[in-house]
Regions:
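Secondary-structure boundary/capping signal
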Residues: 33, 66, 88, 202, ...
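Phosphate-binding site recognition
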Residues: 4-260
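Conserved small/polar residues in nucleotide/adenosyl-binding loops
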Residues: 1-5, 395-402
Length: 404
């Protein structure tokens, strides 16, 4: 039922005050279940600062015996956490549930473009991070390249200004946050490296990093199975920020002068395989964690591991380590986003890395490859030594068939 459907209601009722509108909704909720949704609540709260106190009063005194179901939505995470969920908020203690809407994974993202190639869908996921709003704004029709030219590498486009606008909306000192994000995008991952690039003290940068982590822009990672410590690194968690800071600032001159269409092939596109490396690792991890139904162990968690090989005295990294719910069997995996076929040397390498990792008594090896596998590695799979997977379709990664 709408308000105008009620007996004696005007066809298009108008309310001169918020109290009048809320009173009408309250009356309706006495008769039937009402789901009252306020979208982008932060905008309303800024325009009408007293609205939270008004809702507090009506929740406490008028809706306790009603059938009202109130939903407050907002894209400003900092506002929702402090002004709605925070202890200082008039609404504190009155929520019955809260949901943080997470980005889509690669499989869910591909549903938006069922007619595009697997590689294009993977790239769209890598650019947008699976955020539906960004997927729609990128507006890929026939070509990702054309969509980027029109809807990102153009000063008048929505996505061109999005990171700056988000930082201004969420943060009081966007310049410092921008410098930190830029430093991480350029390869600084440890706290000391980031502070050197930013030119601030460690304690100052650590405080700002915490805020960026809370906002989901940055993530703090430690080698799986290990406690936070000297090995802790910082990465960009938001793929759209990662893409934007990787390709927009360095090409700003070409974008401003309108030369980006000419420079795009060698200044942007040729670096996509390198950029997609981390994205592909996440896709493979998600496949094992959420979609694979024939794993040899029940996974507790999945992630990366890095450390020092004491014999060779060099740093190594394992793309995928899957830990067991129980027992001492682990999954060890490698992800290669390149067109070349992967051979037996990769299997030998991850066996060496597993020995350095050293946490398990038995290891199950997985290799993901965009470009497929050599005959020798396929034969190793037939002998049960390794499981090989290729993105025959990014919407359904499946075991590589030896007949292919």
């Amino acid at each position: 039922m709408c308000i105008r459907d009620r007996p004696n209601a005007e066809s298009s009722p108008e309310f001169t005050t918020y109290d009048a509108a809320l009173d009408e909704l309250t009356a309706l909720s006495k008769e039937q279940r009402i789901v009252f949704v306020i979208d982008e609540y932060p905008y309303l709260a800024k325009a009408k600062p007293a609205i939270s106190a008004m809702l507090q009063h009506i929740i406490d005194h008028k809706w306790t015996d009603s059938k009202m179901y109130l939903i407050l939505c907002g894209s400003s995470m900092s506002f929702m956490e402090s002004q709605v969920l925070g202890k200082e908020s008039p609404l504190y203690g009155r929520r019955t549930a809260q949901f943080k809407i997470m980005p889509l994974d690669y499989k869910e993202t591909a549903v938006f473009h069922p007619n595009l190639s697997e590689e294009d869908n993977a790239l769209i996921y890598g650019i947008t991070g699976g955020v539906p709003h960004y997927i729609n704004k990128l507006d890929v029709r026939d070509s990702v390249d054309e969509a980027l030219m029109e809807n990102l590498f153009d000063r008048s486009s929505y996505l061109y200004e999005e990171p700056a606008n988000l930082l201004k909306q969420e943060l009081r000192e966007p310049a410092i946050y921008n410098a930190i994000i830029k430093a991480i995008a350029e390869g600084a991952s440890r706290l000391n490296d980031i502070t050197t690039k930013v030119g601030e003290e460690n304690s100052v940068v650590a405080k700002y990093l915490k805020t960026l982590i809370d906002l989901g822009i940055v993530k703090k990672e430690t080698p799986i199975t290990e406690k936070p410590g000297k090995k802790t690194i910082y990465l960009l968690a938001d793929n759209f920020f990662r893409f934007w800071y990787r390709f927009v600032p360095v090409n700003a001159s070409a974008i401003d002068s309108g030369r980006i269409a000419k420079t795009y092939p060698h200044a942007v596109k040729q670096y996509f395989p390198d950029y997609m490396g981390l994205i592909f690792e996440k896709m493979c991890q998600d496949y094992l964690l959420y979609y694979a139904n024939d794993l040899p162990i029940e996974l507790s968690e999945i992630g990366q591991w890095w450390g020092t090989d004491p014999k060779k005295k060099k740093q190594i990294q394992i793309d995928i380590v899957g830990t067991p719910v129980e027992g001492n069997d682990y999954i060890i995996g490698s992800c290669k986003y390149r067109n070349e076929k992967i051979g037996l040397d990769e299997l030998e390498l991850i066996r060496e890395y597993a020995a350095v990792f050293g946490k398990g008594t038995n290891y199950h090896y997985y290799i993901f490859s965009k470009g497929g596998f050599t005959d020798g590695l396929l034969q190793a799979q037939e002998r049960g030594e390794v499981q090989l997977l290729t993105p025959v379709s990014y919407t359904h990664l499946r075991a590589h068939e030896t007949s292919l």
